[in-house]
């Protein structure tokens, strides 16, 4: 994935370790403890592009048993290493609601089947 692929509704897979090392200290713990990870990979969706501030707002899926917050939203700098992010195949864009309805097993299947570019 590159910056040009970051459209609202794009669902992607990214290495959790890369994101964790790029986060500020207090965000690191929240991310490690609350975002659903499988095989060191996380699944997210592009929610908003803030050109003025230079950030892309993304929501990451949390474990299915968390009924309070189905996702955690964080800002990712435009200068991030976008080639670490892989678009989920099919090119279909999701609404935020559709993304938050994904189950852990759906994400595991995407990762196991390498259903991303």
Model-derived regions, located:
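Intrinsically disordered, low-complexity, charged/polar segments
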Residues: 55-117
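Extended low-polarity, hydrophobic cluster-rich segments
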Residues: 11-16, 40-45, 75, 84-85, ...
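Short coil-to-beta transition motif at edge beta-strands of beta-rich domains
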Residues: 5-36
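Basic/aromatic-rich interaction segments and small domains that mediate binding to polyanionic partners
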Residues: 26-74
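Generic short amphipathic/hydrophobic targeting helices enriched at N-termini
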Residues: 4-7, 42, 106
């Amino acid at each position: 994935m590159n910056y040009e692929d970051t459209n609202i509704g794009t669902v992607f897979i990214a290495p959790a370790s890369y994101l964790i090392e790029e986060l500020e200290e207090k965000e690191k713990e929240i991310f490690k403890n609350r975002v659903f990870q499988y095989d060191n990979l996380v699944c997210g969706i592009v929610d908003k592009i803030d050109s003025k501030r230079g950030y892309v707002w993304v929501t990451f899926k949390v474990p299915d048993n968390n009924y309070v917050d189905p996702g955690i939203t964080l800002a990712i700098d435009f200068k991030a290493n976008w080639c670490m992010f892989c678009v989920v195949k099919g090119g279909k864009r999701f609404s935020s609601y559709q993304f938050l309805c994904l189950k852990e097993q759906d994400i595991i299947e995407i990762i196991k089947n390498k259903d991303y570019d």
